[in-house]
Regions:
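Tandem CBS (Bateman) regulatory domains
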Residues: 38-73, 77-87, 102, 107-125
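A generic helix-loop boundary/linker signal
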Residues: 2, 32, 54-55
């Protein structure tokens, strides 16, 4: 799931809610990732200018501040990706190719599901 930078703030918020995701990558020029937005970013934007909330919802998502994002490549060491997610308290990291074109997103849930399928660990004391 991703949204184009020409989407409205309202469309992005509604997609986050309807798809039950925590955040959504924003792309431009095809699928080149330019940012990532979550509900908190949108709600803070609305709360900081409550009198103009309806106007803000109609704005294009590219017109609001998109925080810098960390990305990973498909070949990235999953342990390093997990460590970065833990250190920076990230819920997910977008996966991009060498041209920053969005290929997917890896979330904490994805990692936990993958780990749950590993063989059981044997602990010795």
């Amino acid at each position: 799931i991703y949204m184009d930078n020409k989407s409205t703030v309202e469309d992005v918020y509604n997609t986050i809610r309807s798809k039950k995701v925590h955040q959504i990558p924003i792309t431009a020029f095809g699928k080149k990732i330019i940012g990532i937005v979550n509900k908190k970013v949108i709600l803070n934007l609305l709360m900081n200018d409550i009198e103009n909330a309806q106007e803000i919802l109609k704005r294009k998502i590219e017109d609001i501040y998109l925080p810098e994002i960390l990305t990973a490549e498909p070949e990235s060491d999953v342990r390093k990706v997990v460590q970065i997610m833990l250190d920076l308290k990230l819920d997910a990291i977008p996966i991009v190719d060498e041209n920053d074109v969005l290929m997917g997103i890896v979330s904490k849930t994805d990692i936990l599901k993958a780990v749950s399928h590993l063989p059981k660990l044997q602990l010795w004391s």
